[in-house]
Design a protein with these regions (language model features):
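Short coil/linker segments at helix-helix boundaries
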Residues: 1-17, 27-63, 73-108, 124-137, ...
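"A position-specific structural signal for the A-helix of alpha-solenoid helical repeats
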Residues: 24, 31, 70, 77, ...
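Surface-exposed substrate-engagement region within the catalytic domains
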Residues: 104, 112, 116
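A cross-kingdom marker for long, charged
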Residues: 139-164
Length: 164
């Protein structure tokens, strides 16, 4: 993931106004941060870099559904890992912003299985069992989606496995 993030940084230098250069920078840093400890990720400043790249993506292309999904997960994961107070003060993580980004992602990509899966994951991180019915409903919707490509097929199968 770090190599891919570095390639995205090169793409940002060459194409600073390309939203996907910024999105894939955030995406790969985010995936990398999920593979290391929260302490290590915080020390490396990954949270701020992810937020900056996602914000730039959305500045360039406000209807970028995947960036809205990722921004929603950014807020949800920060809150889940370090709490609302510290996450909010340090990284600007906010439940309302997370929910707004998930809502926009669904608005821009209403049939996308990954948007529904990540929204479900975000709801669970933010609310736990209190929103279990909503989490389940989103996974059911994702599992019943029609795949447009191989990646969506894998997403649908993932949603189905969550329901078993």
């Amino acid at each position: 993931f770090l190599e891919a993030a570095e390639r995205a940084e090169q793409a940002i230098e060459e194409m600073p106004d390309d939203p996907n250069s910024h999105y894939f920078h955030a995406f790969n840093l985010g995936r990398y941060s999920q593979s290391i400890s929260i302490v290590k990720a915080l020390k490396q400043g990954i949270g701020g870099k992810v937020q900056k790249s996602l914000s730039r993506t959305l500045d360039l292309l406000p209807e970028h559904a995947d960036a809205h999904t990722a921004m929603g997960m950014y807020h949800a994961e920060i809150i889940d890992k370090i709490g609302k107070l510290v996450g909010g003060m340090t990284y600007g993580a906010d439940v309302k912003q997370a929910m707004e980004h998930f809502r926009k992602a669904l608005e821009f990509a209403p049939h996308s299985p990954i948007v529904k899966i990540e929204y479900a994951n975000g709801l669970y991180l933010l609310y736990g069992d209190k929103r279990w019915d909503d989490v389940s409903e989103l996974n059911v919707e994702a599992s019943e989606a029609k795949a447009l490509d191989a990646m969506e097929r894998l997403d649908i199968e993932s949603a189905r496995s969550e329901l078993e």
